[in-house]
Design a protein with these regions (language model features):
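Conserved small/polar residues in nucleotide/adenosyl-binding loops
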Residues: 238-243
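Active-site glycine-rich loops that stabilize anionic/oxyanionic intermediates
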Residues: 52-55
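Conserved alpha/beta-hydrolase
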Residues: 68-88
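Alpha/beta-hydrolase fold nucleophile elbow
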Residues: 119-128
Length: 249
């Protein structure tokens, strides 16, 4: 059986089941990502968790605990450029990807790993925010899962028609003149977790907010700031027909 290299996991802030182990995986384009596994002895099935933008494995420790209580093994990952996975630019706080479809290579690596380990079936999957956008495209060509759930899926970015046109033009110019790896306009190293609870855009739950702040304060290597211009342009193109894609799944 193939051996997978163990990776760090910050159990002091994940508050997940003690049965967790985490590993490094290498994608087909040689990007190193991180995957975590919380095993259940009951083996009712496996739930895959696809995180959103700026998220990381540790955020889903409590979710894994809840799933384990119901007899389910669970899996989550750090997408490229997120958590402890390889960052793609010299500035680790820049949220960047060359093309949005590259995230599919990350999920393919996780599926191959899960198949190798023969994780208990049936398989289920949850896609949150950006993870929902990635998952939607994966489901068009793959039938690994018995059931799928989406949480606030990022199936588009709400922009007025003039602003959308500007974004495409700006993104094209940025690529030609090679500043597409800079922060997108109005964005910076400041991320979701740099706001106060009152101004945050993630949650109305003060306990959850404290949970997230503890994680990124104790382990700042998990943090990601704003996205690059390349990320935004690629996201707009990738999600432009998401509504039609959902019908075809």
């Amino acid at each position: 059986m193939k051996n997978f290299e163990l990776s760090p996991l910050f159990t002091d802030v994940s508050h997940g089941p003690p049965t967790c182990s985490s590993y490094w995986l290498v994608t087909q384009d040689r990007i190193r990502i991180r995957v975590a596994l919380w095993r259940s002895e009951i083996q009712k099935g496996t739930v895959f968790i696809c995180p959103g933008y700026s998220e990381y494995i540790e955020k889903y420790g409590k979710t894994a605990e809840l799933l384990l209580e119901h007899g389910y093994t669970s899996v989550s990952l750090d997408w490229r450029g997120h958590g402890l996975a390889d960052r793609l630019t010299p500035n680790p706080l820049l949220g960047h990807v060359e093309t949005f479809s590259d995230y599919l290579k990350d999920f393919d690596a996780v599926i191959d790993w899960a198949q190798h380990l023969k994780l208990p079936k049936p398989w289920f999957v949850l896609g949150h925010s950006m993870g929902g956008a990635i998952l939607l495209r994966h489901l068009q060509k793959n039938k690994h899962f018995k059931a799928v759930a989406f949480s606030c899926p990022m199936w588009g970015i709400k922009l007025s028609p003039p602003l959308r046109i500007f974004a495409y033009i700006y993104g094209s110019l940025a690529r030609v003149f090679k500043f597409d790896k800079n922060f997108a306009p109005t964005r910076s190293e400041k991320g979701y977790f740099d706001e106060s609870f009152e101004k945050n855009a993630l949650t109305n739950d003060p306990d959850m907010w404290s949970y997230l702040i503890e994680q990124t304060t104790k382990h700042p290597s998990l943090k990601v700031g704003g996205p690059s211009t390349r990320w935004v342009t690629s996201c707009l193109l990738y999600t432009s027909d998401a509504a039609d894609d959902s019908i075809r799944v």
